[in-house]
Amino acid sequence: MKNIYTDLQKLMEQDNKKNSYVLLDENNGCVAGCRCGVSIYRLTEYGKVDAHEDQEGFFVISGKGMAKVGETEFEVHEGMAFLVPAGVWHTLCSCSDTEPLMVLWFHSAV
């Protein structure tokens, strides 16, 4: 049986310099492209833009920030969820130099 769980705290202790941690993927038994993880945005300027073949969902765990999805830019905050359609460029950043934006992201099975 595959390891069906992951501990974010342990991942962060192993490498606290990373900005993104995969929590669940094919190594945990996810199939057909299902993936889930946490990203931490510490910068107040947008970083790398991304686009994927599948849709990507986000849930803000903590902090405040900005999201740019295609041509739409909006503020995000704790408790907020949003969806990025397949093939659409997106990026996020924090609104604070002292409090990072932490989001859960997931890719659905295709």
Predicted regions and their residues:
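Short histidine-centered beta-strand/loop micro-motifs
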Residues: 25-26, 46-52, 93-95
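A short, N-terminal "cap"/entry segment at the start of jelly-roll beta-barrel domains
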Residues: 1-35, 48
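Short, conserved beta-strand element in jelly-roll/cupin
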Residues: 40-42, 51-67
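Short acidic-glycine-tyrosine-enriched beta hairpin
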Residues: 71-86
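Short strand-coil-strand connectors
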Residues: 68-72, 97
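Ligand-binding loop in jelly-roll beta-barrel domains
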Residues: 86-110
